[in-house]
A protein has these predicted regions:
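Fe(II)/2-oxoglutarate oxygenase catalytic core
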Residues: 1-118
Length: 118
């Protein structure tokens, strides 16, 4: 018999509203892709875990201007952009920014899941 459990989202641990949920099983993590022009669900178990937490906060949505409206965006480092100010960089600290600052329907939450710090 399989027992399905629902991920629960605790109250924020900090005054800034950040909640850190370490050590959740995300399945096997594949090698980092060599190119950024591929559309993959690199880790389906991680995607389901992320969506379970997001579902507790509200309805997950995507914006047309951000990766064509994808709700889940697999972002991974790419060697050719490692020193640039882009989402696929890995050797620089990204500057603080938002793509939806002037959108009439701003997000209330941003949910991030890190699979590997490479």
């Amino acid at each position: 018999m399989t027992v399905v459990t629902r991920a629960t989202t605790p109250q924020p641990f900090t005054d800034s509203g950040v909640t850190l949920l370490p050590n959740y099983f995300t399945g096997l993590v594949p090698p980092t892709p060599l190119r950024s022009d591929i559309d993959i669900d690199a880790c389906p178990t991680a995607t389901r875990t992320l969506m379970q937490f997001a579902d507790n906060l509200g309805r997950a949505v995507g914006y047309d201007r951000e990766r064509g409206g994808q709700v889940i965006q697999d972002i991974f480092p790419v060697r050719s952009t490692e020193h640039q100010q882009v989402s696929s960089s890995s050797k620089v600290v990204l500057g603080s920014h938002t793509e939806s600052a002037f959108h009439p329907h701003k997000p209330r939450y941003v949910v991030l899941l890190c699979l590997r710090g490479d």
